[in-house]
Amino acid sequence: MKCGVCLCVVMAVLAAGALAQPVVPVEAVDPMEQRAEEAPRRQLRAVLRPDSEPRARLGALLARYIQQVRKAPSGRMSVLKNLQGLDPSHRISDRDYMGWMDFGRRSAEDYEYPS
């Protein structure tokens, strides 16, 4: 679980880094053509600047998600807490039975079948 979360975070960081890199022109262009191409780019940058706010929100959401994952119960303690909430007359009162199915293994051991 933790490995999957780490992988998602690394992929999100790499994607954000790739999207944040500027586009480099491949060939040298005349100064007049370069100015003509820069005008739409400037307008595009002006439009995209408010878009940095959702990126900040995405970072905040990722941080909140990671905190929730760290606080989530895991392992044996969560199983023991689940057992405490069960009714004492419940059929499955053994902690080893929580979270898995035995498919009748114990019932087959309890009874001797004639062969």
Curated annotation (Swiss-Prot):
Propeptide stretch(es), residue numbers: 21-45, 47-63, 107-115
Annotated positions of the Phenylalanine amide modification: F103
MF (Gene Ontology): hormone activity; neuropeptide hormone activity; peptide hormone receptor binding; receptor ligand activity
One GO term (biological process): positive regulation of protein-containing complex assembly
Keywords noted in UniProt: Amidation, Cleavage on pair of basic residues, Hormone, Secreted, Signal, Sulfation
Sulfotyrosine modification, residue list: Y97, Y111, Y113
SS bond list: none
UniProt site positions, description: Cleavage: R106, S107
Main location: secreted
Subunit structure of this chain's protein: Binds to CCK-A receptors in the pancreas and CCK-B receptors in the brain.
Family: Belongs to the gastrin/cholecystokinin family.
Function: This peptide hormone induces gall bladder contraction and the release of pancreatic enzymes in the gut. Its function in the brain is not clear. Binding to CCK-A receptors stimulates amylase release from the pancreas, binding to CCK-B receptors stimulates gastric acid secretion.
Protein name: Cholecystokinin
Organism per entry: Rattus norvegicus
Encoding gene (name): Cck
